[in-house]
């Protein structure tokens, strides 16, 4: 093997010539013949490599300097150029290090613990300039073809899916990335602790004490004996189909109905994935029913049934290894569970749990549209339905927890599901279904999706700093609201039959929601000193319209089975506007004041959580209501409403005393409205800030003053 180290060379010169360096090396002493001036007798010093001419001719070179014999004879320019240094071979030990590093990156990536900037490995580098090098992450592009090249979905025969968007993992080959069979997973997840060691202690014990956190660290347990009887299961399934499924459309009812009928007869034969669906259906069915219905159908109080099935849902998720699942039934069950829990648990805990659902969906590739990934038509529709339920749920969680963080619109390209009925799609279909015109089973969900997609579709611009969306001016807001209203009216509401409970609910909620958007856009006028009486009354009329629609939906007997949805949906802007104007003594006439308080009473009658719950938002609304009552109660001598009595009882220890405030001066009456002004200090009439996706279900997503409420003392 030739040495590639270049040595110093000597340039020979005649006695009358100058020394001319041919290489960047110190010159040696000239030969005696050179000193004596004998050019013809010049001695040469050989190079350690051939000249370029001899290399090309593939002839022997005597490597003389400055000109070899061959070049001198042929009168060619003799050029010596050293070979580039050869890349040193990696030792086997170094290869092992890179292989282990790639393996560890795969593990971290599978558990979403590897940041995008560190998602590459030095094992495939081309240079030796550094010990470890990383590639810059590929930017997310909206082009569906780009997504197809950047990542792919791997489907197994049992319907599992795994989305891969990492060059290393793709290079590893698809075969290594498939999920383990369920039988192997059981052995892999087997708890090796003894029975005495299985009970978590310390911090783990504190986590396990919380029913939800226990699902993260719990052990597998059989649920066969906890299934209801076949007759009870049939009743729960019918309740779910009637009360829940029309408003969620996460499941394909014909397919699940067959599975449900088979499994409810033989619970021991159910798979772990399907068992998650079974128990969440039981739980959600009970959640959607009243206490009287539960007692009549099952002879148990609603609270007792909810507690029982909530425990079994959590255990079923543990049994299915839900934190690393790639199975659609498990994520469908978990999403349904979160929808029911959204108003039942702490908002910060709910935000974390919703984040888990989003990560699982991204791991399964739901954030990429199935058509661009080449999936079957049935899979495409079901994945779209599930992802578009997670979007508003994630936005709701981010808003109610105060983080304001939700899925960035630039991180997904999943299209809305088609306007079709369940009988138009089925597993194994090869041709995409034809979308129908008019009202379908998807009418409620699609109407909500149009509103959720409102800001993304209508050409809004992003702020220079942050991810919130900002319109240019009030005229743009009004124009865009009109456009989305016309779109929804044309596509859906014009086909609604108000005798159909689902259509009646859809019409009421959507029109109420659009009015609430208009109200939100105009609410900052209340803070302006130049607002006219006519402008204020137009705002009041709009707010009253929203409250009246809400009360109408609640009072309609045909929509009683959808009340669970209405508990999570209320447009608080309208209530705030009414209370703000009630607090202005003299704005309402006595008859108008009585009518306004009647509308507020209806709100509290329909939303008893305003009195019972202790969430920050509800406590703030209660304080605002009491301020308005103490500043400007009705003029008649009717008895004090029950909701005011309950609020005074709860908040009197906090410093609100009705007796001390029974007679208010004009200054104190003005102070009664001062609390409202705090909600408008940072608002103006031209900006409308919404965090990412618009969420029809989120009360705080409608409530632009919610974050200011969180900064207001509740004492």
Curated annotation (Swiss-Prot):
Viridicatumtoxin and its derivative, viridicatumtoxin B, exhibit anti-methicillin-resistant Staphylococcus aureus (anti-MRSA) activity. Moreover, viridicatumtoxin and a C2 acetyl analog, spirohexaline, have been demonstrated to inhibit bacterial undecaprenyl diphosphate synthase, a potential new target for antibiotic development. Pfam families: Fungal_trans (PF04082), Zn_clus (PF00172). CDD domains: fungal_TF_MHR, GAL4. Residues 119-144 are annotated as: Disordered. Its main location: nucleus. Residues 51-78 bind DNA. One of its GO terms (cellular component) is nucleus. GO terms for molecular function: DNA binding; DNA-binding transcription factor activity, RNA polymerase II-specific; zinc ion binding. It is found in: Nucleus. Keywords: DNA-binding, Metal-binding, Nucleus, Transcription, Transcription regulation, Zinc. GO terms for biological process: DNA-templated transcription. Residues 119-136 have a biased composition (Polar residues). Probable transcription factor that regulates expression of the gene cluster that mediates the biosynthesis of viridicatumtoxin, a tetracycline-like fungal meroterpenoid with a unique, fused spirobicyclic ring system. This is Transcription factor vrtR1.
């Amino acid at each position: 093997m030739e040495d590639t180290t270049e040595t110093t060379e000597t340039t020979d010169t005649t006695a009358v010539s100058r020394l001319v360096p041919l290489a960047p090396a110190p010159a040696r002493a000239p030969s005696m013949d050179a000193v004596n001036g004998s050019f013809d007798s010049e001695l040469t010093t050989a190079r350690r490599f051939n000249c370029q001419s001899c290399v090309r001719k593939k002839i022997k070179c005597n490597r003389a300097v400055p000109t070899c014999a061959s070049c001198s004879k042929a009168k060619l320019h003799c050029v010596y150029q050293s070979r580039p240094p050869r890349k040193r071979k990696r030792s086997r030990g170094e290869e092992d290090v890179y292989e282990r590093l790639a393996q560890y990156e795969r593990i971290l990536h599978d558990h979403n613990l590897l940041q995008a900037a560190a998602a590459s490995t030095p094992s495939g580098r081309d240079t030796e300039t550094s010990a470890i090098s990383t590639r810059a992450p590929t930017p997310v592009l909206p082009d569906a073809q780009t997504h197809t090249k950047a990542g792919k979905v791997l489907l197994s025969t049992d319907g599992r899916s795994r989305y891969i968007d990492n060059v290393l993992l793709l290079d590893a080959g698809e075969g290594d990335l498939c999920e383990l069979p369920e039988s192997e997973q059981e052995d892999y997840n087997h708890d090796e602790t003894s029975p005495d060691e299985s009970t978590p202690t310390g911090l783990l014990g504190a986590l396990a004490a919380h029913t939800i956190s226990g699902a993260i660290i719990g052990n597998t347990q059989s649920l066969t004996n906890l299934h209801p009887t076949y007759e009870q299961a049939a009743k729960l399934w019918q309740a779910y189909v009637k009360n829940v499924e029309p408003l969620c459309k996460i499941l394909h009812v014909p397919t699940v109905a067959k599975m449900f009928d088979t499994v409810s007869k033989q619970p021991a034969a159910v798979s772990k994935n399907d068992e998650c669906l079974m128990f969440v259906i039981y739980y959600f069915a009970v959640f959607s029913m009243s206490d009287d219905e539960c007692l009549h159908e099952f002879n148990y109080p609603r609270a007792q049934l909810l507690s029982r099935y909530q425990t079994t849902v959590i255990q079923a998720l543990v049994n299915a290894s839900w934190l690393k699942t790639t199975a659609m039934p498990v994520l469908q069950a978990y999403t349904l569970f979160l929808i029911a829990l959204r108003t039942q648990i702490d908002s910060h805990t709910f935000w974390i749990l919703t984040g888990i659902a989003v990560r699982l969906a991204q791991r399964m590739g739901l954030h990429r549209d199935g058509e661009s990934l080449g999936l079957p038509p049935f899979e495409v529709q079901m994945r779209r339905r599930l992802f578009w339920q997670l979007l508003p749920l994630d936005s709701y969680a981010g808003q109610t927890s105060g983080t304001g963080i939700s899925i960035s619109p630039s991180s997904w390209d999943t299209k809305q599901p088609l306007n079709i009925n369940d009988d138009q799609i089925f597993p194994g279909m090869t041709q995409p279904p034809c979308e129908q015109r008019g009202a379908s089973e998807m009418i409620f969900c699609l109407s909500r999706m149009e509103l959720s997609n409102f800001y993304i579709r209508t050409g809004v611009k992003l702020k220079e700093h942050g991810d919130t969306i900002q319109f240019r001016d009030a005229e743009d807001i009004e124009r865009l609201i009109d456009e989305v209203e016309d779109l929804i009216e044309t596509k859906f509401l014009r086909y609604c039959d108000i005798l159909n409970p689902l259509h009646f609910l859809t019409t009421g909620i959507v029109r109420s929601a659009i009015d609430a958007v208009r109200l939100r856009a105009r609410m900052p006028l209340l803070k302006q000193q130049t607002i006219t009486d006519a402008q204020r009354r137009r705002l009041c009329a709009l707010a009253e319209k929203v409250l009246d629609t809400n009360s109408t939906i609640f009072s309609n007997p045909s929509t009683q089975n959808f009340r669970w949805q209405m508990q999570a949906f209320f447009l608080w802007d309208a209530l705030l506007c009414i209370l703000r104007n009630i607090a202005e003594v003299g704005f309402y006439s006595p008859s108008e004041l009585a009518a306004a308080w009647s509308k507020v009473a209806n709100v509290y009658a329909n939303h008893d959580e305003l009195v019972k719950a202790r969430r920050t938002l509800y406590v703030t609304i209660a304080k605002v209501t009491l301020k308005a009552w103490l500043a400007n109660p009705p003029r008649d001598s009717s008895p004090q409403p029950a909701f005011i009595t309950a609020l005074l009882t709860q908040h009197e220890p906090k410093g609100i005393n009705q007796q001390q405030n029974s007679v208010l001066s004009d200054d104190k009456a003005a102070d009664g409205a001062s609390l409202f002004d705090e909600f408008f200090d940072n608002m103006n009439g031209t900006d409308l800030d919404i965090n990412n996706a618009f969420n029809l279900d989120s009360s705080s997503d409608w409530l632009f003053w919610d974050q200011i409420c969180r900064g207001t003392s509740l004492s």
